[in-house]
Amino acid sequence: MNRRRRIYEGKAKILYEGPEPGTLIQFFKDDATAFNKKKHDVIDGKGVLNNRISEYIFTHLNKIGIPTHFIRRLNMREQLIKEVEIIPLEIVVRNVAAGSLAKRLGIEEGTVLPRSIIEFYYKADALDDPMVSEEHITAFGWASPQELDDIMALAIRINDFLSGLFLGVGIQLVDFKIECGRLYEGDMMRIILADEISPDSCRLWDVETKEKMDKDRFRRDMGGLVEAYQEVARRLGIINENEPPRGSGPVLVK
């Protein structure tokens, strides 16, 4: 059995060397973390669901001309992706007050914002991913002004698409987090969407009941995380109504 070279391991995913130059294999783990690993658990089946949901969303984004790193899903837990140079920022798009925004500004959770708000956080676990401004980003060279414009344009288009997609299946897109990277193609470089989009990185509420269908179920000790993720997948038509919960999937080849 061939051993694959591990490139990077994060909180919820592992990146391995891909089969061809310029590619990587992205493996989705069952680890659930919150508050920068201060809270941690392993929830059987979570990685499989995130892989399927993220595949579905990235495939649709590619089809409408939003560039992503996604190439194809390989199996229940793995995707083949393009290798990019990750920009060290988390880009958060907020449509409804929730989480840290509600707490920071004293806004009642669930309040619809006057317009969508884009926030930037510097990716540094040791610092608890501090919120930063565009001035910080350009001053420290994390991204150029043009790259920031490209990132914001991508974020707005993704928000428009996701809001409509989820609303069509009775889900409100409260907010979501994305990461972007630089894709080098010969002498050209462009900014594309990387990482994942799943209930791990979105706040999703049922339109009618406001029931949480995302990682807040883990953050707030509500339970039922896998069931909520399965419901998101069912509503999107990714898994059938009667499909049983998945187990751990194929054994990871290290």
From Swiss-Prot:
UniProt keyword list: ATP-binding, Ligase, Nucleotide-binding, Purine biosynthesis
Species: Sinorhizobium fredii (strain NBRC 101917 / NGR234)
PANTHER family: MULTIFUNCTIONAL PROTEIN ADE2, SI:DKEY-6E2.2
One function term, GO molecular function aspect: ATP binding
Catalytic activity line of the entry: 5-amino-1-(5-phospho-D-ribosyl)imidazole-4-carboxylate + L-aspartate + ATP = (2S)-2-[5-amino-1-(5-phospho-beta-D-ribosyl)imidazole-4-carboxamido]succinate + ADP + phosphate + 2 H(+)
Signal peptide range: none
Enzyme Commission number(s) from the entry: 6.3.2.6
One Pfam family, short name: SAICAR_synt
Biological processes per GO annotation: 'de novo' IMP biosynthetic process; cobalamin biosynthetic process
Classification via InterPro entries: SAICAR_synt/ADE2_N, SAICAR_synt_PurC, SAICAR_synth, SAICAR_synthetase, SAICAR_synthetase_CS
SUPFAM superfamilies: SAICAR synthase-like (SSF56104)
Family membership noted in the UniProt record: Belongs to the SAICAR synthetase family.
GO cellular component, as recorded: cytosol
Protein name stated in the entry: Phosphoribosylaminoimidazole-succinocarboxamide synthase
Pathway of action: Purine metabolism; IMP biosynthesis via de novo pathway; 5-amino-1-(5-phospho-D-ribosyl)imidazole-4-carboxamide from 5-amino-1-(5-phospho-D-ribosyl)imidazole-4-carboxylate: step 1/2
